[in-house]
Amino acid sequence: MPMIETINLTKRYGELVALNNLNLTINEGDCFGFIGPNGAGKTTTIKILATLLKPSSGQANIAGLTIGYQNRQIRPLIGYVPDFMGAYEDMVVTEYLEFFAAAYNIHGQQRKKVVRDVLELTDLGYKATAEVNSLSRGMQQRLAVARVLLHDPKVLLMDEPASGLDPRARIEMRELLKELRRMGKTILISSHILPELAELCNVVGIIERGQLLFNGTVDEILRRAKVGHVLHVGVTDRFEEAGNLLARIPGVKKVSIVNDDSGNGRMGKILHVNYDDTAGQSVSDLPNILINSGFRLTKFTEEPVNLETAFMRLTKGLVQ
């Protein structure tokens, strides 16, 4: 049974369609990276899953329970971290956490233990007596995570948790999320920091204009986005002749000679090849073609496609 599921989920604001028949499945223990341009529908989706917003049509489920009909049973299962933390700034950290623990009906010594545990998990124990308004942005975001962990939810819904954080705070947040994943939490996280999502998440969804363009593993999205290869080919000499040979191979879109700094302090030249192996031979055949034609290879590498590149290839940058 999926831990998070949406079925033809739609949200309208008057004439504006923020979500358009969104179908999403996230299994227990998954860390799902939700990617899309501003205005794509990420926050709307997360707010519906957090039971804070009613869908116009369609269905959303948490652990098999239907949002809108079983919210009372759903809320103990989820922890929602918005992109901006609303804090009672005149409280100290322990008061803040104890206040929310009481709201979850955690009382007495159990409350104190739970507060100590989440402070330790989020590495905020040394700030237990500090006022909330004295915390840095990164610490406040970790405090927001500590707050939603008080009742030990199965599902974490996180809307841009690293937004506005400096590099050190982002690293600390990433390590915290890795630990939560090791604990078996199901995590849905939206973020614009795509390299970190690629490292953290095992599943990714790309949304644009309220529609899900892709839903699958990071490896699958990289394969799907890789409509062509970018190859760096080095030969000892006869660059133009090698380039002309490659240009005649079916599937080669473009060949150019570019400068290459090999890292040894000497500037050389390489062939920059755009190649689509769906239209011709496999990319692994190209070295043999060159060698059999009398060229000596000094380099044959493929430019990696990362999550940022995949995102740019699969989206058009459109918003509602």
Q: Model-flagged regions — what are they?
A:
Residues 7, 234, 258, 301-303:
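Solvent-exposed beta-strand sheet faces enriched in polar/charged residues
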Residues 10, 94, 194, 219, ...:
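Alpha-helix N-cap/helix-start and coil->helix boundary motif
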Residues 274-320:
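C-terminal coupling/interaction segments
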Residues 174-275:
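ABC transporter nucleotide-binding domain
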Residues 7, 56, 253-256, 298:
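A short, local hydrophobic-aromatic micro-motif
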Residues 2-6, 11-209, 213-214:
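ABC transporter nucleotide-binding domains
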Residues 28, 126, 235-237, 275-277, ...:
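Non-catalytic surface loops within mature trypsin-like serine protease
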Residues 75, 119, 222, 287, ...:
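Conserved protein kinase catalytic domain
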